[in-house]
Amino acid sequence: MRREDILVEEVQDITLDDLRGSSLLEVYNKIYGFSAESIYRGSRILKRIVSECDLRFISFTANLVSTGLRGLFADMIRRGYFNMVVTTGGTIDHDIARSFGGKYYKGSFEFSDEELRKINVHRLGNILIPFEDYGGMVENAVNRILPPLVKEKREWSVYELLWEFGKRIEDKHSILRAAYETNTPIIVPGVVDGSFGTNLFIQSQFTGLRINLFEDMRLIKDRVFSSKMAGALLIGGGISKHHTIWWNQFRDGLDYAVYLTTAQEFDGSLSGARPREAISWNKIRENAEQAVIYADATLALPILATSLIS
């Protein structure tokens, strides 16, 4: 390491005028220190994913779909920024519930959960969900939409079934609707883990429905193997993160990766693992452009998204 190689670009002080006249991302680049640099660098990589990659993954966890970010996810899909979605079963629950009239409310982390249970209100962080606006909404939607589909054919892949549900949704903020409109596959490897999957199972007892998860695997396999450049925005951890990077090992790894997370790597968890660990598994290429942003997605994702529309 030589001083002249690393002491190249100085940190810049910012002023109130900068906050009024510059883009927030450019302000972060001037600040540079600590998390500001990772958000700026992540935004630059995200722009390259959208402009250069023919395969563009976004993976995220269901809790975010209970917030106002749901509409942002739908809009990014509708505008074609991403053409492959990997998520969890709860995403489908929240999207269906809210699409068919379910109301989610602003609350507090500090509310008494014992008292909320007495008045039939779920708490998801500081989001409040009346009992009747969640499980019942999903159950009614499945009971109404699924039987005619099973009469057409008994065996369905998950992504095709979700397109059919999206086709019957009129809410412009719906992720399922946006995916249907753009033929964007939504891959849900843990589809049975939630209200939607449970109701599919119940309906299968009466309708003969069969879910073919291997067809979803075939689709993601074909997309990965045929891609020339692949990038991913991975928000949160768990099965959606792992399924995304897992399949990309078969093309020698992602070319671009942006992790947005609050998980830490000290416990050896998949959720906390950084991109450098994925390199050892061949899931991200050694020369890939990558960034880790340690932040709550409700704070950082809207800022990152501005880089796509600026």
UniProtKB/Swiss-Prot annotation:
GO molecular function: deoxyhypusine synthase activity
Catalytic activity: [eIF5A protein]-L-lysine + spermidine = [eIF5A protein]-deoxyhypusine + propane-1,3-diamine
Cofactor: NAD(+)
Taxonomic superkingdom: Archaea
EC number: 2.5.1.46
Pfam families recorded: DS
InterPro entries, A to Z: Deoxyhypus_synthase_arc (IPR022899), Deoxyhypusine_synthase (IPR002773), Deoxyhypusine_synthase_sf (IPR036982), DHS-like_NAD/FAD-binding_dom (IPR029035)
Active site location: 283 (nucleophile)
Keyword Cell cycle: no
Pathway linked to the protein: Protein modification; eIF5A hypusination
Protein function: Catalyzes the NAD-dependent oxidative cleavage of spermidine and the subsequent transfer of the butylamine moiety of spermidine to the epsilon-amino group of a specific lysine residue of the eIF-5A precursor protein to form the intermediate deoxyhypusine residue.
The protein's name: Probable deoxyhypusine synthase
Gene that encodes it: dys
